[in-house]
Structure formats: C-alpha cells, structure tokens
C-alpha cells in the first residue's frame, strides 16, 4: 500500500482506517485478517486467537489512537464457563498495550496520525513492535509446558 497524504478536512475515521490497513498489510501473509468494523487484526491458531486492536480517539477531529495486543481462547472460555457455572465468560488470557512488551518507559503511548510524517512514524513504530516483540511473544504459546513454566517463574512480562 502506498504512503498517502490526506487533504485537509479528511474525516478522522478515514485516516485511522488507512493507518490500521497499513499496519495489517505485512501480517496478512502470516495468516492474520484485518477487520475494519472491529479495528483489529487477528489470527486463529489452534486453541488460541492472537490479535492486535486499535482504540481510536476520533471525536472532535482527533486522530490519535492506542495499540493493544490480546491472546484469547474459546477453549479457555468454555472451561471457565464450566468452572463458574455461567453461560458467558471471559476468553482472555493476556492483553495490554503492545508497547508493554518492549522496554519502553511510556508503555501506553498514544499515536497521532493526522500528518503524513506522524502517521509514517507511528506505522513504523507499531509495525516494529509487532515484528520484534508481539510475534515472538505469540510464538511462545506453541510450547505450552515451557510457557507455563516461564510464566510461573517470571510472569508474562519478565522485563517489567
């Protein structure tokens, strides 16, 4: 997808969606799907769903957002439902700001994407965090015994 500069007066939602599409682009060949309606990029892999979602603040012309990741499992949700005796329950395992996977001090950054320069910087930063930190974090779920041992000893985020 080409870099795109938007004319003044472009709706914030259009800029936000374009930014999400650009972030999703390199993940599509890896089996991820982008859902414009949910502001997320997700992939089902075995019993897990790995996702990235973007929380926009597009009110009153603002074009800022926060980027998050999430690991969930319908299997875990079913187990919790049986344990709790309820029909609906939470399927989440772990999720927070993507930046929390890094050693960054500001671990809940808001990304401004109104100008071409800001948008390109944000796309590069988030894409880098996904490639360098989130995808390796998701890969840990392919070896559950080791993951459980690691989490028991150090938690999900040993660098925190």
Question: Where does each model-flagged region fall?
Answer:
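Acidic, metal-coordinating catalytic segment for phosphate/diphosphate chemistry
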Residues: 27
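Intrinsically disordered, low-complexity regulatory regions enriched in serine/threonine/proline
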Residues: 1-18, 22, 34-36, 42-160
């Amino acid at each position: 997808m080409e870099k795109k500069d938007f004319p003044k007066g472009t709706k914030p939602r259009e800029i936000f969606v374009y930014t999400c599409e650009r972030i999703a682009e390199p993940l599509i060949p890896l089996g991820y799907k982008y859902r414009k309606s949910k502001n997320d990029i997700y992939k089902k892999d075995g019993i897990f769903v790995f996702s990235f979602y973007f929380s926009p603040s597009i009110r009153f012309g603002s074009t800022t957002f926060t980027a998050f990741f999430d690991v969930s499992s319908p299997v875990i949700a079913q187990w919790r439902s049986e344990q709790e005796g309820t029909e609906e329950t939470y399927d989440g395992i772990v999720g927070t700001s993507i930046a929390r996977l890094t050693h960054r001090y500001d671990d809940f950054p808001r990304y401004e994407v109104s100008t071409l320069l800001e948008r390109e910087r944000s796309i590069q930063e988030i894409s880098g965090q996904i490639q360098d930190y989130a995808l390796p974090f998701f890969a840990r779920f392919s070896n559950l015994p080791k993951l459980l041992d690691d989490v028991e000893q150090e938690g999900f985020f040993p660098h925190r």
